[in-house]
């Protein structure tokens, strides 16, 4: 038993005027007053800690709830019919047919990754994997969305190697393939990097698990790693506040991960599920035991009593508040019927997983009681802990938004040599250069079910070895577009993720998101947030695919400067047969090349605008989601395509370069019908476009015409190792080797040819 002297409920009643450090825990004056009103007294230290954790921005969504409701308001019955678990659960779960379900979610670990890059990123992977485990699923793959400051910024040089090393170390040790992602460099992320991790898992429909505590007398069992002092205050210290300059040393609030412990925990959980001994389950992530137990209690049909004296600890004399707020990793909390406790403990012992019975479900409805050292340190309604306050914060369009949307001048090369130089400059830019320097550290093919990963439009995985049924997943975002017009920016992210999935031949079925924004106390940021939510919700409704869940990360700023608003959007698609999926590597034999979709003179927020020094201004490309649907109708179930590659940042020039580099193929292309300006044809970033390779051009042209998809023949591939480009009145050539050298050298040169302990440079 701990020798720590607790502040008990009895003490709180006797000392009502005791000063408490509620502000240091992130609570406002009115929130503290509300807690006292709920309890009818001052809170104990443990109660104050639990309320501060659960009412933090990270856990309560108190500034975003009023806007997130719009996702539910725009979800039709038809859209919701395939969602087995949606918004509010640990992860969205989608019924994909044949008794199979897929769960996926993306979550942020931004602030911890700035403070301690390796552990912050590693535990971000571990946390999202446990979210998937808590749904009753086996995790099968991860992805990541990373944002850093400018490539030459000293802070980027400090943070990126640790983040990449953390992701690769944890994911590789778990034996989970990393099947895709994005890495973006922009000044706005200096001092506040974004580390968003996505995980996907599979399960049988009947094996779905949910987070609730029901059944009076059922036991609450904590299992996994022991509880220590790491990560205390993570969600309130790091997840709910912005950084000031020089605040990178908030180390006590950063969790420490052990991937080998999590790997064992995965197998232990799966055996527990198979044995049928779990009534409800919750992972321990942000908010630790305080969050897990209070959420289980709030979602159940009774109350809960927890005895902290039974919690396995790895530090001596921990207070009740410390035990509850600890964010030690690799822990789960389960509700188990009394008759199944023995079997539960046996399975944990088999896997050498530490476990302990720490409480039980009671018949005291909406009562959450916690005991430590034999004394009651918490006695509160769990519903008030779980629900938290809801703020409808001021929303105001920024005063400079109109000025920002004015189209500025950009350099427009006309001379052949200038256009060629611009092309090489673009592919070599930090925005578009090869990410192999990073991704080669990730194991993409472990488990043997990865069909597409490296340089693919979307990650493709087989989930059923007998039927070859599979899924395609893509996650995308553009902070530059969203800064210019948040509603359109969010829809462009949705459109790109949707198009990436479609270009593999998969049928999109669901959406997830991670919304990364600045301070919610800034009315301009809240306008960006509201507009982005509405854009994403309206876009998902138009496409007919539901938002199955998501995450919000506020306070992403350094001082008063917020990051670019960055709504990361993930789309999940289903493939009936992964062997028929469409890749993005040109076949060895020559094929005709076609461009699907129209090209307009759209450079607002483009990479060319950034690389040419024109800043950020204008309007982003027009998004037409009906055009995206027409592309889906053309691709899903089709066998017309030998390869495909969507167009996004960098436009057609970037797509042609990547196709040629990956296959070491040359090509002859005539762009005179794409746009009168060769420069615009190559570098504009119009949406709803895909380049395809096919030897069945006439069939493609006929089918595209039937669906209303604009189609332009570009030319054909060859073995010349040269791209020959023809415009309306100019022609030039560029060798594939020139493009490859420009594309591959940027990151290795910037980081001295090594990133982290696991670096393997291709």
Swiss-Prot record:
Main localization category: cytoplasm
Pfam families for this protein: AIRS, AIRS_C, FGAR-AT_linker
Catalytic activity: N(2)-formyl-N(1)-(5-phospho-beta-D-ribosyl)glycinamide + L-glutamine + ATP + H2O = 2-formamido-N(1)-(5-O-phospho-beta-D-ribosyl)acetamidine + L-glutamate + ADP + phosphate + H(+)
Annotated pathway: Purine metabolism; IMP biosynthesis via de novo pathway; 5-amino-1-(5-phospho-D-ribosyl)imidazole from N(2)-formyl-N(1)-(5-phospho-D-ribosyl)glycinamide: step 1/2
Keywords noted in UniProt: ATP-binding, Cytoplasm, Ligase, Magnesium, Metal-binding, Nucleotide-binding, Purine biosynthesis
Matches recorded under NCBIfam families: FGAM_synth_II, PRK01213.1
Protein name: Phosphoribosylformylglycinamidine synthase subunit PurL
């Amino acid at each position: 038993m701990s020798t720590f002297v607790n502040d008990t409920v009895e003490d709180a009643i006797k000392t009502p005027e005791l000063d408490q450090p509620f502000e240091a825990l992130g609570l406002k004056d009115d929130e503290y007053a509300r807690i006292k009103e709920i309890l009818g007294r001052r809170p104990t230290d443990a109660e104050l800690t639990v309320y501060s954790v659960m009412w933090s921005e990270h856990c309560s969504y108190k500034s975003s709830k009023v806007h997130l409701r719009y996702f539910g308001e725009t979800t039709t019955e038809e859209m919701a019919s395939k969602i087995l678990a949606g918004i509010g659960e640990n992860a969205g779960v989608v019924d994909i047919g044949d008794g199979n379900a897929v769960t996926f979610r993306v979550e942020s670990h931004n602030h911890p990754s700035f403070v301690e890059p390796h552990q912050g990123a590693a535990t971000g992977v571990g946390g999202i994997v446990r979210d998937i485990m808590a749904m009753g699923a086996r995790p099968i793959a991860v992805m990541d969305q990373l944002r850093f400051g400018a490539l030459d910024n000293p802070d980027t040089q400090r943070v990126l190697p640790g983040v990449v090393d953390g992701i690769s170390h944890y994911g590789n040790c778990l034996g989970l393939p990393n099947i895709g992602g994005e890495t973006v460099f922009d000044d706005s992320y200096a001092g506040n990097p974004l580390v968003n991790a996505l995980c996907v898992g599979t399960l049988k429909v009947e094996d779905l698990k949910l987070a609730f505590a029901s059944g009076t007398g059922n036991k609450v069992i904590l299992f996994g790693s022991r509880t220590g002092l790491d990560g205390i205050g993570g969600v309130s210290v790091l997840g709910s506040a912005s950084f000031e300059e020089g605040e990178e040393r908030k180390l006590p609030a950063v969790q420490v991960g052990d991937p080998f412990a999590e790997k064992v925990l995965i197998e232990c959980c799966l055996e527990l599920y198979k044995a049928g001994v779990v009534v409800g389950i919750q992972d321990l992530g942000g908010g630790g035991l305080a969050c897990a137990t209070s959420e289980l209690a709030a979602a159940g049909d009774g109350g809960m009593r927890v005895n902290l004296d039974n919690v396995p600890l790895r530090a001596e004399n921990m207070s009740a508040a410390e035990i509850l707020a600890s964010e030690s990793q690799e822990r789960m909390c389960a509700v188990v019927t009394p008759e199944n406790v023995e079997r539960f403990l046996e399975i944990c012992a088999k896997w050498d997983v530490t476990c302990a019975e720490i409480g039980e479900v009671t018949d005291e409805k909406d009562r959450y009681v916690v005991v430590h050292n034999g004394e009651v340190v918490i006695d509160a309604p769990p519903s008030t802990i779980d629900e938290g306050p809801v703020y409808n914060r001021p929303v105001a369009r920024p005063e400079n938004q109109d000025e920002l949307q004015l189209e500025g001048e950009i350099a427009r090369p006309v001379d052949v040599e200038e256009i060629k130089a611009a092309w090489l400059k673009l592919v070599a830019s930090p925005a578009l250069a090869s990410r192999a320097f990073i991704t080669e550290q990730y194991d993409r093919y472990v488990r043997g079910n990865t069909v597409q990963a490296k340089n693919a439009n979307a990650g493709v995985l087989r989930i059923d070895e007998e039927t070859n049924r599979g899924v395609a997943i893509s996650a995308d975002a553009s902070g530059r577009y969203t800064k210019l017009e948040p509603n359109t920016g969010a829809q462009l992210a949705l459109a790109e993720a949707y198009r990436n999935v479609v270009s593999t031949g998969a049928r999109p079925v669901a959406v997830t998101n991670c919304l990364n924004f600045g301070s919610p106390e800034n009315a301009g940021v809240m306008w960006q947030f509201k507009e982005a939510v509405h854009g994403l919700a309206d876009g998902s409704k138009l496409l007919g695919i539901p938002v199955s869940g998501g995450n919000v990360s506020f306070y992403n700023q350094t001082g008063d400067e917020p990051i670019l608003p960055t709504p990361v959007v993930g789309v999940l698609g289903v493939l009936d047969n992964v062997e028929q999926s469409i890749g993005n590597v040109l076949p060895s034999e020559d094929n005709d090349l076609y461009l699907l979709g129209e090209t307009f003179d759209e450079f607002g927020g483009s990479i060319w605008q950034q690389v040419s020094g024109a800043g950020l201004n204008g309007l982003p490309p027009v998004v037409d989601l009906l055009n995206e649907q027409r592309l889906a109708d053309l691709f899903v179930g089709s066998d017309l395509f030998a390869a495909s590659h969507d167009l996004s940042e960098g436009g057609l020039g970037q797509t042609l370069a990547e196709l040629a580099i990956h296959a070491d193929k040359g090509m002859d292309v005539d762009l005179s019908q794409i746009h009168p300006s060769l420069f615009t044809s190559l570098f504009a970033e119009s949406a709803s476009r895909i380049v395809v390779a096919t030897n069945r051009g006439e069939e493609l042209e006929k089918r595209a015409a039937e669906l209303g998809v604009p189609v332009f023949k570009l030319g054909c591939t060859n073995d010349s190792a040269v791209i020959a480009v023809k415009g309306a009145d100019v022609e030039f050539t560029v060798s594939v080797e020139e493009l490859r050298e420009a594309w591959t050298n940027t990151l290795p040169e910037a980081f001295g040819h090594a990133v982290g302990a696991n670096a393997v440079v291709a």
